[in-house]
Amino acid sequence: MSGLVRISTGARLHFGLLDVAAPFGGCGVMTDRPETIVEAKPAAAYRCATTHAGSTDHWQRAEAIAQRLGSQDSLPKVEVRIVQAAPSHNGLGSGTQLSLAIAEAILLASNGSPVDRERLIAAADRGLRSAVGTHGYFTGGFIAEGLGDDENQKLNRLDERLDMPSPWRAVVLLPKRDKTGAVEDSETVSGSVEQAKFDQLAPAAQRRGELKRVLLDEIVPAIRTHQFEAFGEAVTRYNRGGGELFAAVQGGPYNGTGTTDLIAELLNAGHHGVGQSSWGPGVFAWFPTPKSAWCFCDAWNDPARNAYLVSPKRSGRTVQFD
């Protein structure tokens, strides 16, 4: 094929894992923003360009994916351009969405359609612990995965996929970073740092059972029946319970005093569906209508943080050919 391939995908809010050992499992929701956009087109030789901050990390990520997709002595003959990427290390699953978009863009630009999904996932090299963002890349929606106790495949199966009620919205609160990119009172957790933390933790079979019950008996039915308050209460409790699995390595159910204090402030103000997405520092709260979410954004934006209104995605990534 010839011409430009353009992949657009969103982000994911992770409500928490079921356990700290395989098959892990968990749930979350895909959102429309922050958006990631990757383009690729045939070229005489492989190259990657970016128009977005963080170009070194993005360039290295793209080249690693190209190496997995290339032959022993050459990379795919495509030009990859990262047009837009969600901010990294905020708990929004940006690495998974970017990696999958890069891999799919390279495959489509070099080989044409259709793309073998297993090859795409292998090239992106994601889903080691959580498969929410990987499944959600293709489907959108609320995702629950890894609910079986004996799964041994590399990527957990998709157990539940639901559309969120159309009026519901979430607001993501992200602390503003200093000039070094750090967030006060919050440790960035990824890569080898993340692995080291998991290595310190022991499986928690009883807690897994409790969290699985909340997920299947409370969160899923509340989404299906559009019961907003029941959904919010269950998500808050599930998120805290999942966070307590990591208390030994993050100082409590949430990662750092800043996140802990913000969640307490939100709950004391009476908000619903409040929690930390993944390792944070992104914090979410859910709202029954767009208007209530917008009012919250106006009230809670301040010099220390940004408030972003997001809509649940009802479909997976989009692919365009020019």
What are these language model-derived features?
Residues 9-11, 32-34, 76, 128-130, ...:
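Short, basic and Ser/Thr-rich N-terminal targeting/leader segments
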Residues 39, 270-277:
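Short, flexible, solvent-exposed loop/turn segments with mixed acidic/basic and small polar residues
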Residues 83-108, 129-137, 274-278:
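Glycine/serine-rich anion-binding loops at beta->alpha junctions
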Residues 1-94, 104-115, 312-315, 320-322:
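ATP-binding N-lobe of GHMP and related small-molecule kinases
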Residues 276-288:
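N-terminal pre-core extensions flanking Radical SAM catalytic domains
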Residues 79-81, 284, 308:
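A structural signal for isolated positions on well-ordered beta-strands in alpha/beta enzyme cores
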Residues 18, 30, 93, 97, ...:
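Gly/Ser/Thr-rich beta-alpha loop segments that engage phosphate groups in nucleotides
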Residues 2-6, 16, 22-26, 115-272, ...:
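ATP-dependent small-molecule kinase catalytic core of the GHMP/sugar-kinase superfamily
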